[in-house]
UniProtKB/Swiss-Prot annotation:
Chain positions recorded as ATP binding sites: G8, Q9, S10, G11, A12, G13, K14, S15
Binding site for GTP: D56, I57, R58, N59
GO molecular function, one term: ATP binding
Species per Swiss-Prot/TrEMBL record: Vibrio cholerae serotype O1 (strain ATCC 39541 / Classical Ogawa 395 / O395)
Keywords: ATP-binding, GTP-binding, Nucleotide-binding
The protein's name in its UniProt record: Nucleotide-binding protein VC0395_A2112/VC395_2645
Family: Belongs to the RapZ-like family.
One of the Pfam families matching this protein, by short name: PapZ_C
Length: 286
């Protein structure tokens, strides 16, 4: 039997992840006390159905090491993994403002502000985050995008396929927190300084023509392709379920978007499971 523990910050998308897992055939339980987890797993052992359980700030034991002890015990007879959903403080503040929901820690006796509650929860969940097998940052993702990301990561893990996530970003918005590899392409020729090209993105044909007219752009693309072609077999043997490759330029609009799209399409054509995201572009268009 397979058990996925879903954890993460309040407002980061745990309920979305549980709905996706339910659609994938998992028996999902929200807010189950950790002390009851072993007994619950034993009770459903005979059904042969995969199970997903959420552990978060609502049911976190006072002693964080208890979670690891319980999971270590369950791993002896089950395939156990943890999915942790995270999001930036700014994203969480915006989501709570839009939904007008109350943060779980805001109900405590100290009655912290929303910003304080988010920061405190981050500290309390730190040990769980360190144990995560799958770490997803839902910042700047819509419900549909997050659902698709969770589905691809879970399905890829079940098939033992490595999911390659190609992600463009702008350095002025900050580094992505979930990247395994980061390529800084700010040294490449910048279409931003061409007035006719400035409003366009790396997905538009004139930007492609501009960048493909520079040999250094094509050489860098080929070198990144060769790097991952060479090392992918080793990464796949390392029991990884996904690999996040982030490519950044200044604003995340032209150079990084072009290279991310090209690399993602290249590896998809080779038969790999690929997901392409343009995080800063999505932020600019929202």
């Amino acid at each position: 039997m397979r058990l996925i523990v879903v954890s993460g910050q309040s407002g980061a998308g745990k309920s979305v992840a549980l709905r996706v897992l339910e659609d994938l055939g998992y028996y999902c339980v929200d807010n189950l006390p950790v002390s009851l987890l072993t007994a619950f797993i034993q009770s459903v052992q005979g059904s042969q159905q995969n199970v997903a359980v959420s552990i978060d700030i609502r049911n976190l034991p006072k002693e964080p090491s208890l979670v690891q002890d319980v999971l270590d015990q369950l791993k002896q007879n089950n395939d156990v993994s943890m999915l942790f959903l995270d999001a930036s403080k700014e994203t969480l503040l915006k989501r709570y403002s839009e939904t007008r929901r109350i943060h779980p820690l805001s109900l405590s006796q100290s009655k912290p502000s929303l910003a304080q509650a988010i920061e405190l929860e981050k500290q309390l969940l730190g040990p769980l985050k360190e144990q995560a097998d799958l770490l997803l940052d839902s910042s700047n993702q819509s419900l549909h995008e997050l659902s698709e990301t969770v589905r691809m990561r879970i399905e890829g893990r079940e098939r033992k396929d490595l999911v390659m996530v190609f992600q463009s970003f702008g350095f002025k918005y900050g580094l992505p927190t979930d990247a395994d590899y980061v390529f800084d392409v700010r040294f490449l020729p910048n279409p931003h300084w061409e007035p006719d090209l400035r409003p366009l993105t790396g997905l538009d044909a004139p930007i492609k023509s501009f960048l493909e007219g520079h040999s250094e752009v094509m050489e860098l693309k080929q070198q990144i392709q060769k790097f991952f072609e060479y090392w992918l077999p080793m990464l796949e043997k390392n029991n990884r379920s996904y690999l996040t490759i982030a490519i950044g330029c200044t604003g995340g609009k032209h150079r990084s978007v072009y290279l991310t799209q090209q690399l993602g399409e290249y590896f998809a054509q080779l038969g790999h499971q690929v997901q392409i995201r343009h995080t800063s572009l999505e932020k600019q268009q929202s």
